[in-house]
Amino acid sequence: MKLWKLTGASVAAALSFTAVAQAQSFVAAPAAPPAHPAAYMYGKFAEFLGEESGGEMSANVVGPEVVSLPQMKDALQTGLASVGNSLPLYFAADFPETGVAGDLALAGRNPHAMGWAMTEFVVNCAPCQEEYKNFGGVFLGAGSSDVYVLMTTKPVETIDDLQGLRLRSGGAPYSRWAENFGATPVNLPVGQTFEALSQGTIDGTMASIADMLSYRLVDVATNVLRVPLGTYHVTSNFTVGADTWADMSVEQRTQFAKAANRGDPQLTDRWAYQMPEEANAAVAEAGITDMEPSEEFLAASNAFAEQDVQARVEANPLAADFEALIGKWEGIVEEVGTDPEALAARAWDEIWSGVDFNTYGM
């Protein structure tokens, strides 16, 4: 009888150990410091992954000192990271087709619509999927910044004030906008903006108002002009390493995708809504001149943006596909609102419910 009790206890312990052993932990790399919206998103994702998998999967979130953005490709291919935040425009040579959506940056007026349009675009874009396969990753969604504005160290009230200004540009569409109005675009990593403004190397930046806090531009910028300059939406929030994805069961892939789908709008919510609100308060407190553009300035800027977008749409069917998705998701966001969980539920129905996770990303 004692032997039976001992054996039963041993079996129970073995079963318990097996259950623990089967629970999987994935190294998750937002490639961003704690204050960054990507880190916020990954914190939410860790919660969602536990919920969606019933505790069978977990995320071990690591900082940029372990995996940085430029290291993401190698990290995913070597297994240093199981899932990571990769920006296709950092690897432009690897993502020419995916990057087409980025060339329509000036179309961005609704952050959530841009993030979901990007997600649906890549999921259904065969050449984009091939690019991710060659990259060694699986795409599970995108997000978006707020609408970019102009932050400068010189007053800008009229179009003439742009003449000769050196403006940091985060991509080709912003450079085209600057050049059209007589400014000189300067390609510069966002992390170098503060130093460049401080030293007078540049006169301003076309970027998220959140950079006022993220990169302490609030300490050097003197003027903000709220001319809408589009969004940064070519993200791949949860890029799963190909080997990691292949080792998952179909059920695990589905659960992982559900967690990622819930995490995607958290990036947009933090980057495009929460942080701008905090940055706006900091701008006001610092006494920075904060202006809306004149009707003339706004009309000219919007006209150029429309012309720029249409030129890309007419030249590339993929650009036309993306433009159509922007319109679709602008309508959905207007209907659903900006609550991240409500949008994620709708996105699952619109985008992911038709995906075969037996073959997706394989």
Predicted segment positions?
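Bacterial N-terminal signal peptides that target proteins for export
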Residues: 1-8
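Generic hydrophobic/packing signal
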Residues: 15, 80, 88, 118, ...
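N-terminal secretory/targeting leader peptides
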Residues: 8, 24-113, 139-362
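Hydrophobic helical h-region of N-terminal Sec-dependent signal peptides
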Residues: 10-13, 17
